[in-house]
From Swiss-Prot:
Assembly, per entry: The cytochrome bc1 complex is composed of a cytochrome b (QcrB), the Rieske iron-sulfur protein (QcrA) and a diheme cytochrome c (QcrC) subunit.
Primary enzyme class: translocase
Identification of the protein by name: Cytochrome bc1 complex cytochrome b subunit
Family the UniProt entry places it in: Belongs to the cytochrome b family.
GO cellular component, one term: plasma membrane
Organism of provenance: Streptomyces lividans
Protein's gene: qcrB
Amino acid sequence: MSTAANEPSRSRGKAPAGERVADWADGRLGIYSLAKANMRKIFPDHWSFMLGEVCLYSFIIIILTGVYLTLFFHPSMAEVEYHGSYVPLQGQMMSEAYASTLDISFDVRGGLLIRQIHHWAALIFLAGMFVHMMRVFFTGAFRKPREVNWLFGFLLLVLGMFTGFTGYSLPDDLLSGTGIRFMEGAILSVPIVGTYISFFLFGGEFPGHDFVSRFYSIHILLLPGIMLGLLVGHLILVFYHKHTQFAGPGKTNKNVVGMPLLPVYTAKAGGFFFLVFGVISVVSAIATINPIWPSGPTGPTRSPPAPSRLVLGFSEGLIRVMPGWEINAWGHTLVLGVFVPLLIFPLVLAAIAVYPFIESWVTGYKREHYILDRPLLDRPRNAPTRTAFGVAWLTVYFVLLIGGGNDLWATHFHLSINAITWFVRIAFFVGPVVAFIATKRICLGLQRRDKDKVLHGRESAIIKRLPHGEFIEVHEPISQEQLHTLTAHEQYKPAEIGPTVDENGVERKVSGTQKLRAKLSESYYGEESQIPKPTVEEYKEITSGHGHH
């Protein structure tokens, strides 16, 4: 028996080295069972899902280039005399951090290219996360059970902002010094504890002698470590919850239609990584970003025209357009012109973080009837109120971004900086309201157009003249795929307060919270917030040849 059992293994010969290594690992880690459960994981195919991949690959590029830069950067504020290759600054006294950054740019082989790849990848990472979160927001991909993953993504965006700021501050050039001074002023505006926080951060009076080394530790160890953990958790939850998908034939709330992880998706993802790396490298090779040599080292008597940063620019815009109000009481000054924007900044971020929970409470989506493990994504037009809120927020963001760069707008377009400031102040309050109303009306108009397309077909551009002289355009029925896309979305009813009296005829107490929830729910799912989908009877009428041309 033993001889017969051993015959197949003898005829097969010695297993390949890779298989032997895999067998060794499986015997200790059980990788075969893990691979069996995940290698055939299905991923939907849609261009918007690539936004998350851009963020992931940019983060990997940031880590790779950052490791290279740490080999040559000296995080010290000790003053040295510069004797490097950049002639205009030779002989000048500067911090060792600034001198080492100049050496990376001009003396280290490939150093300038790596610096620029690192910087461009950071910007693309932040911009990619911003756009990715907007995609998740507008399509409703944050709904139960994915609220935790929304929080992970939100924390990645916030930590990415602060990681970018600390990295931007490390070279100790004039631009980074201006940003540090801006941050220090914001910290000092905090009543009671602002001074203590500033002394703790800078190790004494600004600028101190330790902030570069402290920011360096935060930039390369603390924040990236937390972000890496959040990123891993984010990906694990994507696998656990399965991927969301847009409506289409064969797609329901109980399945995922797409490509398997191996070999199709992995091959595409690998190619896309090198494509992202290549594009960033080409951009870095031909487009200079953050040149530190023209402005020189930081100094207390110089202030450059600093452009507003991509994500933190809106916080800078808040401070620039806020009136310089102050309150003097009991020998202390409360600088409202800085402190109020400093309060608004975290409040806006907190509102973004908790929005999924607010919507689930308002709309009742968390009720058992609406719990879906793998919900189909919304088309933004089918969620007019949410889409209007998103566009209103984007309006605020871009208005404040203009405020953050008001000096550059004024100099480049020959405008009055006071006029720009007043425009931003007014648009901050008026713009979101106008954007909300306009967006909601546009969404409802698109819903009406979709309903008309389902009932009457699409326009064919064929004009016919009837016997009595009337001209009409012939409409053709839409495809089954289009029909499914236009009618697959669910339409919910707004939450109701219920009867005003109980079963005994006694008036039931209704709390103010219940009334508020019902009113807000009406704004999401009421008659004025969604156009009813065509009924089966209406569709049968069109398919039977009646009611359309």
